[in-house]
Amino acid sequence: MSDLIELQRNYLIGVLNQIETKNNLKFLIIDKTVETILSYLFLTPQELLNNVTSVDLIDSPTRKGQSSIEAIYILEPTKYNINCIDADFMVRPPKYRRCHIRFLPGLTNPIFQFFQSKRYIAQNLESFKPIELGFFVKESQFFETLQMEHSLQVFFNNNCKALIPTNVRKIVGSLVSLCVITGEYPIVRYSVSNPVEEEDARNGNAVVNANSLTRSIANAFQIAIDTYARNNPDFPPQNTERPRSILIITDRTLDPFAPILHDFSYQAMAYDLVANVDTQKDIYHYSAENEAGEQEEKVSKLVDLYDPDWIDLKHQHIMDANEYIQGRIKELIAKNPLLVDRSNVKNTTDLLSVVAHLKDFDEERRRLILHKTLVDECLGENAERKLADISAIEQNLSGFGMDFSGEKIKHIIDDLLPALAMKEPTILDKLRYIIAYALFRGGIIELDFIKLLNFIGVTHEHENFQQYLKIFRNYDLIDFKLIKDKPKDKPFQKEWFHDTLVNDPNIYHTSRFVPAVGNILSKVIANPLLLSEQYFPYLKDKPIELLNEEEFQAGLANTSANSSSSLRNPRHKAAWTTKSSNIKKNIPRQRFFYYVIGGISIPEIKAAYDQSNLKNRDIFIGSDEILTPTKFLDEVERLQNPREFFKFKEDQRQQVNPPDFLLREMKPVAQPVSHVHLKSQDNSPKSGTSSPKAAGSLKSEPPEKEKKRSKFSRFLKRKSHHDK
């Protein structure tokens, strides 16, 4: 299975190693955005210091230079960063001998002209190239576009429409980076909510329609990746038999159920239910017993790079995760009988206390205590709110009105009302049930919404009454008219792409829902003809031939996905033209890219992993941000708020002038110490001297964001266990 963390790490190291310097000494200067990228790629600073001599934040007051050593700058292309670089060479002696500048995606023409105007940079510039690091690798198969915030507002709030072009360029930069790092030149398909309007638009009969967002991003990406391929003859790689990849671009309107249903996998429950999980930073705050028997406050990262147990556990059903952790605890204790006093062990809580007192197992013990504590919190919230007991109503509503046996439920409201009458679920839980019911019905009148709110105790006098009503109304802005004007109005018409599982003894009753992500990927992997071209048209490259009935059945049998021909790359031959009997077992797996505009839920990310494992394919899924159910409903409620409310970074005054300390004359410092671990010099061709004019082919990207000044401590001074 390909690992996006490893792929991005190797790409970055490759960029660093291609830059040859005297004695192979290199100072790396970064900004806060790149620091965050590095935090997802390198477990310890030493991993990065094997490739460079030192790493510093560009605006750190403790950054020391050396006028005989060359510097590599990997930064966002902002006026502030450019001025900081210029200041490094304005002082005498200059901080560094020469500079190699690598800007992240986002270089606009105005910023490029500003860059060209800097005299000291021009005099000391050794090389200047883009670096394709347009996303954070949050997980081995999930990536997040850089510097996006409130993406649902950007794309669906009419007051924020002016921000769309900037953020489209960010997404395009993210997708191009993905393709460069993976060496893929994908076939592009995009989702369409209204095929009739889409056909008119493609024929030039309509300028704007409901599908313009996905199509515009697909078009912009195609132009950008084609430009990259023209400017880089070695892209895509020629020496591989991997079938051509497929990129599917969708948006948040494709699946309204995924962000609101209660999901019972471990990560989804933790991010939905546990208040002490910081979902923005992927950090869990908790208390645990230490060796002295005292409760101690802890902070742990829930990130793939730091925690192999998290990788194994996060997508398991909570009951399976609990069983796994208990088994691991018992196994650890069983392997160390001489270190354990079993006399007081009566339950799993006692087992956890025993583990806390085990010595010589610090890291394993830390992870077991962490996950046992978090799993217990999830189970506790579930028990207190009776969520699993009520889950059948959600599964039935999202399952087209069918129960676990596949039987159609005649009066589903009779199941909903008892759930709403229960005292254990929170008001927000019940609100999610009501929205699921309205989606199932294709909309209900506002009076019925008010009656249901009153039924759960939210009357006109309730402090959140107007807030909840606004959520119902604002669903119309994301293409779901939940509130019908009249009782006799027809339900809204919507093509559903999610699915439900019935009569399957191998699944939990709480987990029948299949997000649209999983259903779409399942179809396109099995055979592209299974995925409606009407709702998922090809942007450019279309399969070179159609299957006849016999070939279609063969395609279903061998689960090969389609590709299209390309004169550029021989591996772009249609996958189904090779008979299954001739397929080599060692042929690399086809890759599928899936992007959701407007935010993604954790169950949708999990669905991509599930299909990757089931279909034996590499799947990388990305979005602008992760949406928990609470965050999603908050964003929907604010879809009519003015742009000023959100305080977008684009709307804030950005720092331009460099810090004063960078302009002070620096004193010569000692030669670098000889014991620094350096990577042996490679045989890569030297990055030739190039003027800023040589970068004229760089993609235009959005204005970048304000930089913060702080010490480079979060990455370089990170504790080895990432746990306080």
Curated annotation (Swiss-Prot):
A GO term for molecular function: SNARE binding
GO biological process: exocytosis; intracellular protein transport; positive regulation of vesicle fusion; vesicle docking involved in exocytosis; vesicle-mediated transport
Domain of life: Eukaryota
Basic residues compositional bias, start-end: 708-724
InterPro entries according to UniProt: Sec-1-like_dom1, Sec-1-like_dom3a, Sec1-like, Sec1-like_dom2, Sec1-like_sf
SUPFAM superfamilies: Sec1/munc18-like (SM) proteins
Statement: the UniProt record of this protein carries the keyword Transport: yes
Region (Disordered), start-end ranges: 675-724
Gene3D superfamilies, A to Z: 1.25.40.60, 3.40.50.1910, 3.40.50.2060, Syntaxin Binding Protein 1, Chain A, domain 2 (3.90.830.10)
Compositional bias of kind Polar residues: 681-692
Its job: Involved in the final stage of protein secretion.
Miscellaneous comment text of the record: Present with 639 molecules/cell in log phase SD medium.
Quaternary structure annotation from Swiss-Prot or TrEMBL: Interacts with MSO1.
Name of the protein this chain belongs to: Protein transport protein SEC1
Species of origin: Saccharomyces cerevisiae (strain ATCC 204508 / S288c)
Underlying gene: SEC1
